[in-house]
Amino acid sequence: MDGLMSSADEILDIVDENDRVVGQARRGDAYARGLRHRCVFVWARDPEGRVFVHRRTATKLVFPAPYDMFVGGVVGAGESYDDAALREAEEELGASGLPRPEFLFKFLYDDGAGRTWWSAVYEVRVAGAVSPQVEEVAWHGFLPEAELEGRLGEWEFVPDGLSAYARLRAWRGASGPGSVG
Protein backbone atom coordinates (compact mmCIF):
# COMPACT_ATOMS: atom_id res chain seq x y z
CA MET A 1 0.00 0.00 0.00
CA ASP A 2 2.95 2.35 -0.45
CA GLY A 3 2.98 3.17 3.26
CA LEU A 4 -0.54 4.59 3.21
CA MET A 5 -2.96 3.48 5.89
CA SER A 6 -6.31 2.19 4.69
CA SER A 7 -9.45 3.70 6.19
CA ALA A 8 -10.08 0.39 7.99
CA ASP A 9 -6.77 0.85 9.84
CA GLU A 10 -7.53 4.36 11.11
CA ILE A 11 -7.53 4.46 14.93
CA LEU A 12 -10.74 5.70 16.56
CA ASP A 13 -11.71 6.53 20.11
CA ILE A 14 -14.34 4.10 21.37
CA VAL A 15 -16.92 5.83 23.55
CA ASP A 16 -19.71 4.91 25.94
CA GLU A 17 -23.37 5.93 25.95
CA ASN A 18 -22.32 9.29 27.46
CA ASP A 19 -19.66 9.95 24.80
CA ARG A 20 -16.78 9.30 27.21
CA VAL A 21 -13.68 7.64 25.74
CA VAL A 22 -13.35 4.06 27.01
CA GLY A 23 -10.72 2.74 24.60
CA GLN A 24 -9.42 2.75 21.05
CA ALA A 25 -9.79 0.44 18.07
CA ARG A 26 -9.07 0.23 14.37
CA ARG A 27 -11.95 1.60 12.32
CA GLY A 28 -12.54 -1.75 10.62
CA ASP A 29 -12.70 -3.49 14.00
CA ALA A 30 -15.03 -0.83 15.41
CA TYR A 31 -17.49 -1.46 12.57
CA ALA A 32 -17.11 -5.24 12.62
CA ARG A 33 -17.64 -5.44 16.39
CA GLY A 34 -20.29 -2.71 16.65
CA LEU A 35 -18.15 -0.48 18.87
CA ARG A 36 -19.56 2.98 19.51
CA HIS A 37 -17.35 5.78 18.19
CA ARG A 38 -17.65 9.39 17.00
CA CYS A 39 -18.65 10.91 13.66
CA VAL A 40 -19.29 14.35 12.23
CA PHE A 41 -21.98 15.41 9.76
CA VAL A 42 -21.44 18.71 7.94
CA TRP A 43 -24.38 20.37 6.16
CA ALA A 44 -22.56 22.22 3.36
CA ARG A 45 -24.37 25.00 1.52
CA ASP A 46 -23.33 27.37 -1.22
CA PRO A 47 -23.93 31.16 -1.14
CA GLU A 48 -27.39 30.62 -2.71
CA GLY A 49 -28.31 28.28 0.15
CA ARG A 50 -28.28 25.13 -1.97
CA VAL A 51 -27.23 21.92 -0.23
CA PHE A 52 -24.23 19.85 -1.30
CA VAL A 53 -25.57 16.37 -2.12
CA HIS A 54 -23.37 13.55 -3.30
CA ARG A 55 -23.36 9.88 -4.11
CA ARG A 56 -20.82 7.84 -2.19
CA THR A 57 -18.45 5.58 -4.09
CA ALA A 58 -19.05 1.84 -4.12
CA THR A 59 -15.70 1.33 -2.35
CA LYS A 60 -16.70 3.09 0.89
CA LEU A 61 -16.24 0.96 4.02
CA VAL A 62 -19.71 1.80 5.36
CA PHE A 63 -22.83 2.51 3.29
CA PRO A 64 -21.23 2.16 -0.16
CA ALA A 65 -23.02 3.80 -3.12
CA PRO A 66 -26.08 5.61 -1.64
CA TYR A 67 -26.53 9.38 -1.66
CA ASP A 68 -25.82 11.67 1.28
CA MET A 69 -26.79 15.24 2.10
CA PHE A 70 -23.90 15.64 4.53
CA VAL A 71 -20.15 15.46 4.19
CA GLY A 72 -18.28 14.07 7.12
CA GLY A 73 -16.90 10.94 8.63
CA VAL A 74 -15.27 9.47 11.67
CA VAL A 75 -13.48 11.46 14.34
CA GLY A 76 -9.94 10.15 14.73
CA ALA A 77 -8.48 9.09 18.07
CA GLY A 78 -7.72 12.18 20.14
CA GLU A 79 -9.30 14.50 17.56
CA SER A 80 -12.01 16.99 18.54
CA TYR A 81 -15.39 17.03 16.83
CA ASP A 82 -14.68 20.60 15.65
CA ASP A 83 -11.34 19.67 14.08
CA ALA A 84 -12.84 16.57 12.44
CA ALA A 85 -15.70 18.63 10.98
CA LEU A 86 -13.31 21.05 9.29
CA ARG A 87 -10.96 18.27 8.13
CA GLU A 88 -13.76 16.15 6.70
CA ALA A 89 -15.47 19.10 5.00
CA GLU A 90 -12.24 20.20 3.32
CA GLU A 91 -11.31 16.63 2.35
CA GLU A 92 -14.67 15.56 0.96
CA LEU A 93 -15.47 18.86 -0.73
CA GLY A 94 -11.94 19.26 -2.04
CA ALA A 95 -11.97 22.86 -0.83
CA SER A 96 -9.27 24.42 1.32
CA GLY A 97 -9.62 27.49 3.48
CA LEU A 98 -13.22 26.83 4.48
CA PRO A 99 -14.56 28.70 7.49
CA ARG A 100 -14.75 26.57 10.62
CA PRO A 101 -18.08 24.70 10.48
CA GLU A 102 -20.65 25.88 13.03
CA PHE A 103 -21.67 23.28 15.59
CA LEU A 104 -25.45 22.77 15.68
CA PHE A 105 -26.21 19.74 17.88
CA LYS A 106 -25.15 16.20 18.77
CA PHE A 107 -27.09 12.93 18.92
CA LEU A 108 -26.49 9.22 19.35
CA TYR A 109 -27.13 7.30 16.13
CA ASP A 110 -28.07 3.66 16.66
CA ASP A 111 -29.58 1.55 13.91
CA GLY A 112 -30.37 -1.30 16.31
CA ALA A 113 -28.22 -3.66 14.26
CA GLY A 114 -24.80 -2.89 15.70
CA ARG A 115 -24.08 0.43 14.04
CA THR A 116 -23.90 3.16 16.66
CA TRP A 117 -21.96 6.40 16.87
CA TRP A 118 -22.11 9.78 18.53
CA SER A 119 -22.90 12.23 15.77
CA ALA A 120 -22.07 15.93 15.86
CA VAL A 121 -23.92 17.98 13.24
CA TYR A 122 -22.41 21.16 11.79
CA GLU A 123 -23.07 23.65 9.02
CA VAL A 124 -20.59 25.36 6.71
CA ARG A 125 -20.99 27.84 3.84
CA VAL A 126 -18.92 27.00 0.79
CA ALA A 127 -18.17 30.14 -1.20
CA GLY A 128 -15.68 28.75 -3.73
CA ALA A 129 -15.51 25.86 -6.13
CA VAL A 130 -15.50 22.29 -4.89
CA SER A 131 -13.50 19.37 -6.22
CA PRO A 132 -14.60 16.31 -4.23
CA GLN A 133 -12.30 13.35 -3.69
CA VAL A 134 -12.93 10.77 -6.41
CA GLU A 135 -12.24 8.03 -3.84
CA GLU A 136 -15.16 9.29 -1.73
CA VAL A 137 -17.64 10.91 -4.12
CA ALA A 138 -19.03 9.37 -7.32
CA TRP A 139 -21.39 12.28 -8.15
CA HIS A 140 -22.16 15.64 -6.58
CA GLY A 141 -24.24 18.75 -6.98
CA PHE A 142 -25.66 21.67 -5.03
CA LEU A 143 -29.44 21.23 -4.84
CA PRO A 144 -32.13 23.55 -3.53
CA GLU A 145 -33.48 22.02 -0.34
CA ALA A 146 -36.92 21.59 -1.97
CA GLU A 147 -35.30 19.44 -4.66
CA LEU A 148 -33.44 17.45 -2.02
CA GLU A 149 -36.77 16.84 -0.28
CA GLY A 150 -38.18 15.53 -3.56
CA ARG A 151 -35.24 13.18 -4.05
CA LEU A 152 -35.66 11.56 -0.63
CA GLY A 153 -38.31 9.20 -2.01
CA GLU A 154 -36.48 8.59 -5.29
CA TRP A 155 -32.84 8.07 -4.35
CA GLU A 156 -31.36 5.75 -1.75
CA PHE A 157 -29.76 7.83 1.01
CA VAL A 158 -27.45 6.65 3.79
CA PRO A 159 -29.51 5.84 6.90
CA ASP A 160 -27.38 7.85 9.31
CA GLY A 161 -27.61 10.87 7.01
CA LEU A 162 -31.40 10.52 6.89
CA SER A 163 -31.45 10.35 10.68
CA ALA A 164 -29.25 13.44 10.96
CA TYR A 165 -31.40 15.27 8.40
CA ALA A 166 -34.62 14.48 10.28
CA ARG A 167 -33.01 15.78 13.46
CA LEU A 168 -31.72 18.88 11.64
CA ARG A 169 -35.23 19.66 10.42
CA ALA A 170 -36.63 19.21 13.95
CA TRP A 171 -33.79 21.29 15.42
CA ARG A 172 -34.45 24.11 12.96
CA GLY A 173 -38.13 24.05 13.88
CA ALA A 174 -37.28 24.21 17.57
CA SER A 175 -34.66 26.91 17.06
CA GLY A 176 -37.14 29.32 15.51
CA PRO A 177 -36.39 32.29 13.25
CA GLY A 178 -32.79 32.86 12.34
CA SER A 179 -31.91 29.19 12.59
CA VAL A 180 -30.10 27.27 9.89
CA GLY A 181 -32.09 27.13 6.71
Curated annotation (Swiss-Prot):
Binding, Mg(2+): 88, 92
Keyword Metal-binding assigned: yes
Residue ranges annotated as motif Nudix box: 72-94
Coiled coil: none
Pfam families, alphabetized: NUDIX
Keyword annotations: Hydrolase, Magnesium, Metal-binding
Protein name: Uncharacterized Nudix hydrolase SCO1686
Species this chain originates from: Streptomyces coelicolor (strain ATCC BAA-471 / A3(2) / M145)
